[in-house]
Every structure is written in structure tokens, then in C-alpha cells.
From Swiss-Prot:
One of its GO terms (biological process) is proton motive force-driven mitochondrial ATP synthesis. GO terms for cellular component: mitochondrial inner membrane; mitochondrion; respiratory chain complex I. This is NADH dehydrogenase [ubiquinone] 1 beta subcomplex subunit 8, mitochondrial. It is found in: Mitochondrion inner membrane. It is a single-pass membrane protein. InterPro entries: NDUFB8, Ndufb8_metazoa. Keywords: Electron transport, Membrane, Mitochondrion, Mitochondrion inner membrane, Respiratory chain, Transit peptide, Transmembrane, Transmembrane helix, Transport. PANTHER family: NADH DEHYDROGENASE [UBIQUINONE] 1 BETA SUBCOMPLEX SUBUNIT 8, MITOCHONDRIAL, NADH-UBIQUINONE OXIDOREDUCTASE ASHI SUBUNIT. Belongs to the complex I NDUFB8 subunit family. Complex I is composed of 45 different subunits.
Length: 186
């Protein structure tokens, strides 16, 4: 009982002392402001124009996510392209992400940054890549089959041991003289 009371008093004391150290608004500094959050789904052309202006887009280019209950609201549906596809020599405001200030961010930006998914077109088409892969696999299977049918072994001599072919260690009679063993130099 006394330990629980002491713990409760210690927690209250810690809360009182940290109030003076930590600024009051520090806990709110990481939240998104209301104007950063997506608004409701635009139903009229005027709402679409206002949402396009909010995201620094032309009305012709603005297309919101479908209103399917996922909570996207008026956020623009940007093309699913990675940051790799953007011009690396352009003077971006944020060169690591290849983005400019005020530019709308893709909803799945964490998936399309440069060290994740690369959606840029490949220089070789898929059918050519598949032909190369299956050709290599077929060649390797053929080579393994040839190695299995026609085995190749290097000729070897009998195993050579030092000290007269380990005569005593292999159970030889210590009273008899072992036969001399000829060792071959390679």
C-alpha cells in the first residue's frame, strides 16, 4: 500500500517538474494542421476547382481518388510513378526526393521514393528477359545432364601418409620393421 502511494506521488512529482521544462506547445508541433489534411470529396465543379487550387494543380489535371470510403477525400490521385522517373538534372527544391516546394505528394510516397520501388520502364522487354532466363536455365540443365552421363574424374594414386604410412598408428607391430613406402612427388 505504501509502495503504491509512493509510486503515485513520484509520478505526480515528475509530471509537475516536466511542465516547467517542456514548452506547452511542443506536443502539438508534430501534428498536421487542418489545411494540410484532405477535405471532403468534391461533388460540384466549384468544389473541384477549389480543391485543385488547394493542391496547386490545374483543374484539367486534378482528379481525386474515388469516394470509396477509404478516407482520401479531395486528395489528388497522382500517377503511380516512382521518383526514379523524374529528371535527375533538374534543379529540384528537395533534390533527394526530386520534388519542389508546394507540389502535391503522392499518397503512397513512402513506397515510391528512390530507395524502394522503381517503376521506370526497363530497357529490355519482358519477353526478351524471359527468353534469356529460360535459355540460361535450359543450358545449365543440359550441362548437368552431360556431366551426369559422361562423368569425368581425375586419376588419383593411393593416399600417402608420413612416417612409413603411419605404420604404428594403423596397428603395425612395433617389433617388426615396416616395409619401405615409395612417396611420389607431384
Amino acid at each position: 500500500m505504501a509502495a503504491a502511494r509512493a509510486a503515485a506521488l513520484g509520478v505526480r512529482w515528475l509530471q509537475r517538474t516536466t511542465r516547467g521544462v517542456v514548452p506547452l506547445e511542443a506536443r502539438r508541433a508534430f501534428h498536421m494542421t487542418k489545411d494540410m489534411l484532405p477535405g471532403s470529396y468534391p461533388r460540384t465543379p466549384e468544389e473541384r476547382a477549389a480543391a485543385a487550387k488547394k493542391y496547386n494543380m490545374r483543374v484539367e489535371d486534378y482528379e481525386p481518388y474515388p469516394d470509396d470510403g477509404m478516407g482520401y477525400g479531395d486528395y489528388p490521385m497522382l500517377p503511380n510513378r516512382s521518383q526514379h522517373e523524374r529528371d535527375p538534372w533538374y534543379q529540384w527544391d528537395h533534390s533527394e526526393l526530386r520534388m519542389n516546394w508546394g507540389e502535391p505528394i503522392h499518397w503512397d510516397l513512402d513506397m515510391y521514393i528512390r530507395n524502394r520501388v522503381d517503376t521506370s520502364p526497363t530497357p529490355v522487354s519482358w519477353d526478351v528477359m524471359c527468353k534469356h532466363l529460360f535459355g540460361f536455365v535450359a543450358f545449365m540443365v543440359f550441362m548437368f545432364w552431360v556431366g551426369h552421363v559422361f562423368p569425368s574424374y581425375q586419376p588419383v594414386g593411393p593416399k600417402q601418409y608420413p612416417y612409413n604410412n603411419l605404420y604404428l598408428e594403423r596397428g603395425g607391430d612395433p617389433t617388426k620393421e615396416p616395409e619401405p613406402v615409395v612417396h611420389y612427388d607431384i
